[in-house]
Curated annotation (Swiss-Prot):
Its cofactor is pyridoxal 5'-phosphate. This is Phosphoserine aminotransferase. Coiled coil: none annotated. One of its GO terms (cellular component) is cytoplasm. Catalyzes the reversible conversion of 3-phosphohydroxypyruvate to phosphoserine and of 3-hydroxy-2-oxo-4-phosphonooxybutanoate to phosphohydroxythreonine. It comes from Escherichia coli O6:H1 (strain CFT073 / ATCC 700928 / UPEC). Binds 1 pyridoxal phosphate per subunit.
């Protein structure tokens, strides 16, 4: 079978080694003669899976001991509600920084539970889309927390700065599309959450990192399944968790550790992004409209100079084993999502195709 490279924004490509191991263990896991999908989440065998996954995740991100790690349901959209329901306390407002589609979606959900103070960080610089630096973000004095999204998958915009707003500002961040792709200082955040389906594992699992002093503040109307304290008190097993996604994510964590950890991913992700953006920037046939300082290393949107060629580009790239390159309906064009599991070889195959396509149709 020819090599297929999946550039989907999520659910996304998984490491081949992880899929091979899961395939081998699918019907007989740990010598039990059953699948990991069939064993009790409260049995000692799965408890070991859960504990190892949390330990490996903590090791990868150097999570401080005063932070809890929760394995949840609900995805990023679930956390759009969970954050205000858990962190507002007796306050009625929170700061939200709008830099793209997903930040705006979080704001829309937050309006059900509080009065968000919205700061529009989007700007245009020399005709390119960009984000105002954190030093210009206008925060309010009475906010319970400040929320932002470091990587906008649809817009292809990244905010790589580390928050430094003082110890009194609780920073909540949606790391769904950039978690584990580069080192982060967890201690600068109050809450970090991430849907699994991009850099962690299969869809269905959400990981939350929450500073322990923020527990116990949930709104009385907060559903129990979204209550961080209840999830923590029950070791993320208040109800039956997504066990297969948890298991497979644990395999991804071990794969990451075996391949140099987050620091190694950071380097190769930079190489992949530089290769792809390099082809775009050195061409009049392709274009990207994001300022270099805010370009995403995970999600690279680009347009063809002649949009009439879009359909042909997608057809020929798919035939060449380069799948899921169609851009989001909001922005159109193309988008290559190059998360941790995408090897440099895959990006090289894409750029070779792009150069050849331009030669034939430019």
């Amino acid at each position: 079978m020819a090599q297929i490279f999946n550039f989907s924004s999520g659910p996304a490509m998984l490491p081949a080694e992880v899929l091979k191991q899961a395939q081998q263990e699918l019907r007989d896991w740990n010598g039990l003669g059953t699948s990991v999908m069939e064993v009790s989440h409260r049995g000692k065998e799965f408890i070991q899976v859960a504990e190892e996954a949390e330990k490996d995740f903590r090791d990868l991100l150097n999570v401080p001991s005063n932070y809890k790690v929760l394995f949840c349901h609900g995805g990023g959209r679930g956390q759009f509600a969970a954050v205000p329901l858990n962190i507002l306390g007796d306050k009625t407002t929170a700061d939200y920084v709008d830099a793209g589609y997903w930040a705006a979606s979080a704001i829309k959900e937050a309006k059900k539970y509080c009065t968000p103070n919205v700061f529009d960080a989007k700007v245009t610089v020399d005709g390119l889309r960009a984000v105002k630096p954190m030093s210009e973000w206008q925060l309010s004095d009475n906010a319970a927390y400040m929320h932002y999204c470091p990587n906008e998958t649809i817009d292809g915009i990244a905010i790589d700065e580390t928050p430094d707003f003082g110890k009194d500002v609780v920073v909540a961040a949606d790391f769904s599309s950039t978690i584990l792709s580069r080192p982060i200082d967890v201690s600068r955040y109050g809450v970090i959450y991430a849907g699994a389906q991009k850099n962690i594992g299969p869809a269905g699992l959400t990981i939350v990192i929450v500073r322990e002093d923020l527990l116990g503040k949930a709104n009385i109307a907060c559903p129990s399944i979204l209550d961080y304290s209840i999830l923590n008190d029950n070791d993320s097993m208040f109800n039956t968790p997504p066990t297969f996604a948890w298991y497979l994510s644990g395999l991804v964590f071990k794969w990451l550790k075996a391949n140099g950890g987050v620091a190694a991913m950071d380097k190769i992700n930079q190489q992949k992004a530089e290769l792809l953006y390099g082809v775009i920037d050195n061409s009049d046939f392709y274009r990207n409209d994001v300022a270099k300082a805010n370009r995403s290393r995970m999600n690279v949107p680009f347009q063809l100079a002649d949009s009439a060629l879009d359909k042909l580009f997608l057809e020929e790239s798919f035939a060449a084993g380069l799948h899921a390159l169609k851009g989001h309906r909001v922005v159109g064009g193309m988008r290559a999502s190059i998360y941790n599991a995408m090897p440099l070889e895959g990006v090289k195959a894409l750029t070779d195709f792009m150069v050849e396509f331009e030669r034939r149709h430019g």
